[in-house]
């Protein structure tokens, strides 16, 4: 109580508080955290299950990450933890050996795990015994360090192939002071066997065995790290704070911030604190506004509005006069008939196609006789275009149509008999009139042959034409030209009429004055005889060929019969054989014996 009453004591305490506050900016923050440190000498043997029951997806998603976590949390070095790794499936494969590449380097182990992820796919069975024997051989060869702790960690998802041999090898390793731990992952793990294998009872805790699903694979590593590592508490310095920033406001309450460089993940890099610079001055209050009173202005009385006079009713409208009916329109005059179109000139008749030669018949069928060409129909004489067709008068609108008079000629009805062409008097025809079946000269020939443009025939002198001394092949109208080959129709194209059918089924010619009828020539008898000779020659050839083929068939049948008789006689001399009924097929047993050995008759050769 005396100290509390002494003023000097309070003064000293006040000075100490002020000094601490002023020097607080220089004090560094400290954070305490725990970390596992593995400083003991341990030879760790990792046995990795690579059987096909794991599957490629679990291998990539769970096994490789679990193995990577185990390597990253160990203090791997030459003097502390050394690693050996064995992959087992159907056979054991040593990936890392003690005192070799990857045994004391964490970076080398990461490279080996990456190669295992990219180049290996789980396959085969679970041969755990071969992997345990590999560890036993290393200890027997003294590849391990004598003062280091020997620990075997097995990563598996199933039951080993041979339970008895695996248990025997594990017991041998335990006698050599080797600790065995198992991590069982997946649904196919035999928990009872794994507990016995690591030396635990059926019930109770087992620190050297852990099992779970694939998602818990990485968390199950931590209990095994405690076997080789210990947790150490450490202190981390977070660094020096920077100066506080200015207050966010110029008056009243605000905030200030200071920052620093982060040296540890658990350290904060920014801090905020409240601040107050000064009180803000009060805002001046505006004086109240006094309203000015305005004198009231008297309101004038409003005069009442007089009612409006009622509007006079409108006069009724007069009814509209009915419209006068329109006069009937005069009937329109009938349209005048159009002038008839002039008839078009008749087209030239097309030349008839040449009759095709009969094709030679193919062997062996007999050639069919070619049909005789049909005679072309005689063309009807064209209508004289000089007589125009008269148009029919239009019907009168008032009266009905009058019946046609049968005695009056209708221009639209074509007569049955052709109309004779009209020849102007005194006109010379383009071609002379040729006599049909007489040798008499026509009466309309000119007196002198030189007055005509066409050459006329003259009587022959001893079979020679006296008018054709220069050119014996001169074209004379009445001269007969014999055909040069067997075709009787060659050269007759100009002599056969060429009809051309129009839309009204009548035939027209370019020359209206040519009334001569042309008839096609009939094939000569020589042509028919030559054709029959050719047919007889072809028929004789077929008969000869048929005879030869028939003879060859007869010779072949005789040879077959001879071979059959000779074979049957040889079989009879060879001894008793199986019954003929047993040799024959079931469908051939019903045939009569006489029909089986019947020789062809005389009529069969034909």
Swiss-Prot record:
PROSITE patterns: TSP1, VWFA. Changing residue 244 to A: Decreases sporozoite capacity to invade mosquito salivary glands. No significant effects on sporozoite capacity to infect host liver. No significant effects on the numbers of midgut sporozoites. Residues 487-504, 516-532 have a biased composition (Basic and acidic residues). Disruption phenotype: Decreased sporozoite capacity to invade mosquito salivary glands. Decreased sporozoite capacity to infect host liver. Decreased sporozoite gliding motility in vitro. No significant effects on merozoite invasion and development of erythrocytic stages of the parasite. No significant effects on the levels of mature gametocytes and the ability of male gametocytes to exflagellate. No significant effects on sporozoite formation. Dispensable for sporozoite adhesion to human hepatoma HepG2 cells. Residues 301-541 are annotated as: Disordered. Residues 235-281 form the TSP type-1 domain. It is found in: Cell membrane; Cytoplasm. It comes from the Eukaryota. It is a single-pass membrane protein. Residues 43-228 form the VWFA domain. Keywords: Cell membrane, Cytoplasm, Membrane, Signal, Transmembrane, Transmembrane helix. Changing residue 157 to A: Decreases sporozoite capacity to invade mosquito salivary glands. Decreases sporozoite capacity to infect host liver. No significant effects on the numbers of midgut sporozoites. No significant effects on sporozoite gliding motility. Residues 1-24 form the signal peptide. Residues 409-425, 440-450, 459-479 have a biased composition (Low complexity). Promotes parasite ability to invade host hepatocytes. Promotes parasite ability to invade mosquito salivary glands. Required for sporozoite gliding motility. This is Thrombospondin-related anonymous protein. It comes from Plasmodium berghei (strain Anka).
């Amino acid at each position: 109580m005396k100290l509390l009453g002494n003023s000097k004591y309070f003064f000293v305490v006040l000075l100490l508080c002020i000094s601490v506050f002023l020097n607080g900016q220089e004090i560094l923050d400290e954070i305490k955290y725990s970390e596992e440190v593995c400083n003991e000498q341990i030879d760790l043997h990792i046995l990795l299950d690579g059987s096909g029951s794991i599957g490629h997806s679990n291998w990539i998603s769970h096994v490789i990450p679990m193995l990577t976590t185990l390597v990253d949390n160990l203090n791997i070095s030459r003097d502390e933890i050394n690693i050996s790794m064995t992959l087992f499936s159907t056979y054991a494969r040593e990936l890392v050996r003690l005192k070799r590449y990857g045994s004391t380097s964490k970076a080398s182990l990461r490279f080996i795990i990456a190669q295992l992820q990219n180049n290996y796919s789980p396959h085969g069975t679970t041969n755990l015994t071969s992997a345990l024997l590999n560890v036993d051989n290393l200890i027997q060869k003294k590849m391990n360090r004598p003062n280091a702790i020997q620990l075997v960690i097995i990563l598996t998802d199933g039951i080993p192939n041979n339970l008895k041999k695996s248990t025997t090898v594990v017991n041998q390793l335990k006698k050599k002071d080797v600790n065995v731990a198992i991590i069982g992952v997946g649904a196919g793990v035999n928990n009872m066997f794994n507990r016995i294998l690591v030396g635990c009872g059926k019930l109770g805790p087992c620190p050297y065995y852990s099992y779970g699903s694939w998602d818990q694979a990485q968390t199950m590593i931590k209990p095994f790290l405690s076997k080789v590592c210990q947790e150490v508490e450490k202190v981390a310095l977070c660094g020096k704070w920077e100066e506080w920033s200015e207050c966010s406001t110029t008056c009243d309450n605000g905030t200030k911030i200071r920052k620093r460089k982060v040296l540890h993940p658990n350290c904060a890099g920014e801090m905020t604190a409240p601040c107050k610079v000064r009180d803000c001055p009060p805002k001046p209050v505006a004086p109240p506004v006094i309203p000015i009173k305005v004198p009231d202005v008297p309101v004038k009385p409003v005069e009442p509005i007089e009612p409006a006079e009622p509007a006079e009713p409108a006069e009724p409208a007069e009814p509209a006069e009915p419209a006068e009916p329109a006069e009937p329109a005069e009937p329109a005059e009938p349209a005048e008939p159009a002038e008839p179109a002039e008839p078009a000139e008749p087209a030239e008749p097309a030349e008839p196609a040449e009759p095709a030669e009969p094709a030679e018949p193919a062997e062996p069928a007999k050639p069919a006789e070619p049909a005789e060409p049909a005679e072309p129909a005689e063309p009807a004489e064209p209508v004289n275009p000089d007589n125009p067709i008269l148009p029919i008068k239009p019907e009168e609108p008032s009266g009905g149509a009058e019946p046609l008079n049968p005695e009056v000629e209708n221009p639209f009805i074509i007569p049955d008999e052709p109309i004779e062409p009209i020849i102007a008097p005194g006109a010379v025809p383009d071609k002379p009139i040729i006599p049909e079946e007489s040798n008499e000269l026509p009466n309309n020939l000119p007196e002198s042959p030189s007055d005509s443009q066409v050459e006329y025939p003259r009587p022959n002198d001893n079979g020679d034409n006296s008018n054709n001394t220069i050119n014996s092949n001169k074209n004379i109208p009445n001269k007969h030209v014999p055909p040069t080959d067997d075709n009787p129709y060659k050269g007759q194209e100009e002599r056969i009429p060429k009809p051309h059918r129009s839309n009204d089924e009548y035939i027209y010619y370019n020359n209206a004055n040519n009334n001569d009828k042309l008839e096609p020539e009939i094939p000569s008898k020589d042509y028919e005889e030559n054709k029959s000779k050719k047919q007889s020659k072809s028929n004789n050839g077929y008969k000869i060929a048929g005879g030869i083929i028939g003879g060859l068939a007869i010779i072949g049948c005789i040879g077959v019969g001879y071979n059959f008789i000779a074979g049957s006689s040889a079989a009879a001399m060879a001894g008793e054989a199986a019954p003929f009924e047993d040799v024959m097929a079931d469908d051939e047993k019903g045939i009569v014996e006489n029909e089986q050995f019947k020789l062809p008759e005389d009529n069969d050769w034909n």
